[in-house]
């Protein structure tokens, strides 16, 4: 546990579309569990440098889906490092080390929503029982169990399709993005914010994945 220096300063680490278990080995691109682990280590190092410079002691790790790669198509099955059951525990181990690394310097809160590629069943559904049948959900709750006695590590449970979090008066919406982010990203986001505004909820910031691009 780390004493909070400035309650108004909260850092956000966004994890999305990691696609654990995907295996890529071509001249222009390579990806496997080892590379994923190295990338997360580098992300942790850069995050610590940035957050320390801003006096941050509290971090939100926002996981917005597709932590696990799909295996529904033949090319995905042929380009998998392992099966998804074994891959789940490898993913948990890598994320556990990532969280522990950051927790050396910061208090951490972890929240998640489910993606589309990491779902267990082939069909996409929007019912909570269907959406939560996901490797994203499984990884989140395994991590929650792993850290249940840890100090300075907290978990937020909620709607695994879209989750709103209020941080120091700022309403943040977490979502994966499939089904609503398409065409013009800016227009799609404004439509989502408008949907919430019609119910009296003003969204200040939207965190999402799915499109595999930084904007």
State where each predicted segment sits.
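Extended recognition/assembly regions associated with phosphoester-bond processing machinery
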Residues: 1-215
């Amino acid at each position: 546990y780390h004493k909070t220096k400035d309650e108004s300063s909260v850092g956000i680490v966004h994890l999305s579309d990691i696609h654990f278990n995907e295996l890529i080995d071509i001249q222009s691109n390579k990806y496997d569990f080892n590379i994923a682990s190295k990338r997360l280590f580098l992300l942790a190092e850069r995050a610590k440098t940035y957050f320390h410079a801003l006096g941050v002691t509290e971090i939100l790790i926002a996981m917005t889906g597709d932590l696990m790669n799909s295996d529904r198509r033949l090319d995905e099955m042929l380009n998998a490092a392992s099966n998804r059951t074994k891959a789940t525990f490898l993913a948990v181990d890598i994320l556990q080390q990532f969280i522990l690394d950051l927790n050396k310097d910061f208090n951490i809160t972890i929240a998640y929503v489910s993606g589309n590629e990491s779902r267990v069943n082939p069909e996409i559904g929007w019912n909570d029982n269907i959406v939560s049948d996901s490797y994203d959900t499984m990884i989140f709750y395994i991590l929650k169990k792993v850290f249940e006695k840890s100090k300075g590590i907290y978990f937020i449970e909620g709607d695994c399709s879209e989750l709103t979090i209020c941080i120091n008066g700022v309403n943040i919406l977490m979502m994966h993005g499939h089904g609503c982010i398409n065409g013009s990203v800016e227009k799609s986001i404004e439509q989502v914010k408008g949907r919430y505004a019609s119910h009296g909820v003003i969204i200040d910031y939207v965190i999402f994945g799915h499109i595999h691009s930084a904007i």
